[in-house]
């Protein structure tokens, strides 16, 4: 099995790398057929609840569950959370939950648990659900997956400007560092690899305590996080990331007392739209639904 996996990832990497290189050389987007429908708005739900954190910034799972249910129900115009989840997955699906395990700001374990519970309640077998990050290429559930749920916290990032939903799929390639050039502008190519393409059912950008400033690789300072107490949920990863980026930028400007651009600029968000056709990054093409707590919403 190891030989087969290596052969696939090498071939897939070369295929994606060709797209990145050609796009960079000629300065043009990929073929128009890869682009999202330009006439349709992407729905993004921002849900916030100040009670999701206690005084010690520990997460209340019940409150978090209510936030998740409200967001998914609103996203799909469903009558209730159960019907929303049954529209996202079917009982015969094999679902990988792509998390993020960066130790300073990982995907909250209560959220991983909630997603797993909702998937099983929707009829997916427990043995066909797995949450993973760095071992996705070796995880048997991910190797057989028919569906993915993409969930991670937003934070500033040394190479890509922002750690985003788009960037979260970098572990689906065998050599992630090869995507660091040009502020990781080619990350969108990963989403077109055969073992990823078309599988993502839901994107959840965790904005509970996002990191809005950092200096150097793997830098983290609690002083540069804040209790935003939110989740951004969408079927469109680009629209979700663009919304989160607006919040991070607004927080930076407020904190530093003036314009303080994200550095390096998160070029991969716009490129995911204009070069790779993964969704929309433009404000006028995003339908933003705000739910819950509105104080200091920054949007």
Q: Positions of the model-derived regions?
A:
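N-terminal and secondary-structure boundary signal
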Residues: 2-299
């Amino acid at each position: 099995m190891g030989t087969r996996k290596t052969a696939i990832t090498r071939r897939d990497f070369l295929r994606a790398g060709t797209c990145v290189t050609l796009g960079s050389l000629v300065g043009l987007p990929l073929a128009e057929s890869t682009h999202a429908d330009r006439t349709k708005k992407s729905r993004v739900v921002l849900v916030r609840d100040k009670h999701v954190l206690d005084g010690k910034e520990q997460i209340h799972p019940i409150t978090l569950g209510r936030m998740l249910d409200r967001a998914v129900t609103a996203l799909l115009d469903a009558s209730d959370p159960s019907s929303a989840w049954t529209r996202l997955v079917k009982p015969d699906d094999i679902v990988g939950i792509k998390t993020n395990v960066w130790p300073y700001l990982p995907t909250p374990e209560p959220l991983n648990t909630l997603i797993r519970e909702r998937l099983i309640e929707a009829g997916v077998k427990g043995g066909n659900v797995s949450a993973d990050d760095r071992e996705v290429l070796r995880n048997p559930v991910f190797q057989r997956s028919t569906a993915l749920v993409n969930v991670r916290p937003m934070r500033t990032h040394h190479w890509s400007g922002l750690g985003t939903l788009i960037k979260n799929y970098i572990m689906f390639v065998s050599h992630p560092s090869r995507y660091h050039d040009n502020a990781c502008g080619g990350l969108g190519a990963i989403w077109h690899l055969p073992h990823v393409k078309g599988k993502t059912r839901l994107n959840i950008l965790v904005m509970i305590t996002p990191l809005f400033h950092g200096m150097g690789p793997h830098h983290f300072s609690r002083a540069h996080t804040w209790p935003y107490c939110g989740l951004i949920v969408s079927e469109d990863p680009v629209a979700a990331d663009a919304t989160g980026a607006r919040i991070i930028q607004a927080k930076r400007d407020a904190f530093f007392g003036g314009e303080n651009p994200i550095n390096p600029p998160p070029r991969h968000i716009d490129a995911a739209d204009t070069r790779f056709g993964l969704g929309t990054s433009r404000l006028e093409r995003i339908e933003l639904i705000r739910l819950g707590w509105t104080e200091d919403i920054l949007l």
